[in-house]
Amino acid sequence: MKDRISFSSDYTKGAHPLILQRLQETNFEQITGYGTDDYCKSAADKIKKSCNAKDADVFFLVGGTQTNQTVIDMLLEPYEGVVAAQTGHVAAHEAGAIEFSGHKVLTLPSFNEEPQFTDKEKPCYSDQVGKIKGADLKKLIDDFYADDNHEHMVFPGAVYISHPTEYGTLYSKAELEEISGICKEYKIPLFLDGARLGYGLMSKRTDVTIEDIARLVDVFYVGGTKVGALFGEAVVFTKGVPVKHPVPVIKQHGALLAKGWLLGLQFDTLFTDDLYMKISKNAIEMAEILRNKLVERGYQIYIDSPTNQQFVVMEDDKLKELSEHVSYGFWEKLDDTNTVVRFATDWATTVEDIDTLFKYL
């Protein structure tokens, strides 16, 4: 609705103006399809340069769930499943897309840790972080192979993590190195979901770079849908493509766009003059302002998120009033009278947007 402001997610707006400009400029060009065009090649080259992985293979897919399903299916044998946090997107919010492709999601509990953000009056309500721990991953694999009946069970064939996580939290470089080392030890590929990758990379509290990710994982993707593109995700296989013919597999999963240059052109724009990182930084700066204002108003921060997703505990009566003017994301019911909600900033959020939000908070 036009008279409501939205902080419900980071994909409620169209695309960065420079992308729209380039789409307009090239609108009447006649371009080859399915990602075989020069725009896709240029975008792939820029992405490979940004992560210092000149031998990587890059493919442009249409959306996040299609990407997760396609990549995981590429990585696994028919008798294998993918290990993920029980809070992971593939385990909780993809309508069984992984299972629909014939693979089980083998869940691990996400662990808790002491929040870095603290407020003496109201510290973070939860210490949930939505990440998997290396030790838990190793135990799952060891326990599987220690079971005499493991030939009759779903094999752990790949590991899925996201950065940022569903809770907006981040893996440290040490955590990624530990998980990567375990995956290498057991010859299991590591897949990093980067739907919000830009927001993770530009967080003020990260020591992880895109070069680190390319070095430590077997495949990751650069999210466009939530970070300035109209749609699309750029999949980067850093250590070789796991199937002989990837394009037909991508097509089988409904993730191959006939007008593939529309994806390539967008990512070529995002990876020109560091635009992807610049607009991601805006979301982080706006989230910091939002969080500080929430604390000043006395609201209870729920999770210590250093990225663009901010989670807050609100009274249900207040939410009824707020919902008339603001779209927010429902997260979970905390108790009979309180709810956890998510406010998400994005690449285009302004200070004026936040000021408008706080007229109703």
Regions found by a protein language model. Give the residues of each.
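Active-site C-terminal subdomain of aminotransferase-like
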Residues: 111, 155-157, 170, 203, ...
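Catalytic PLP-binding core of fold-type I/II PLP enzymes
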Residues: 171-203
